[in-house]
Amino acid sequence: MDRQPVVYILTNKRNGTLYIGVTSDLRKRVWEHNRDLVEGFTKRYHVHRLVWYELHGDMSSAIMREKQLKKWNREWKLQLIEHSNPEWKDLWSEII
């Protein structure tokens, strides 16, 4: 996967803690999260499993989408994940 603006959701387990982020390099960012190189929420709550991501044409639209998703209630976020990844598989292998 080439560098491209992406909104992503990480979790620690099915229906667990959710983290929504945005990056221009998904591979690198998820790698950093998985190795606890990112201080803060994902390190504290062991949120390392990539369960959803969405590509965008430019960073401004990715940031807008991230903000939108962060305002959603939990049920909507769970439905978004379930729609494209009903098994809650770690999608890391898709992006490496």
Spans of model-derived segments:
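GIY-YIG nuclease catalytic motif and its immediate N-terminal context
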Residues: M1-L55, S60-K67, H83-I96
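Short arginine-rich
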Residues: K67-I81
